[in-house]
């Protein structure tokens, strides 16, 4: 379960 902020931060 990945937060929305983590999606743009790591990817």
From Swiss-Prot:
Its main location: secreted. It comes from the Eukaryota. InterPro entries: Bombesin. It is found in: Secreted. Keywords: Amidation, Amphibian defense peptide, Pyrrolidone carboxylic acid, Secreted. The keyword Secreted applies. The keyword Secreted applies. The modification Pyrrolidone carboxylic acid is found at residue 1. This is Ranatensin-C. It comes from Lithobates pipiens. The lineage of its organism: Eukaryota, Metazoa, Chordata, Craniata, Vertebrata.
């Amino acid at each position: 379960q990945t937060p929305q902020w983590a999606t743009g931060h790591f990817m």
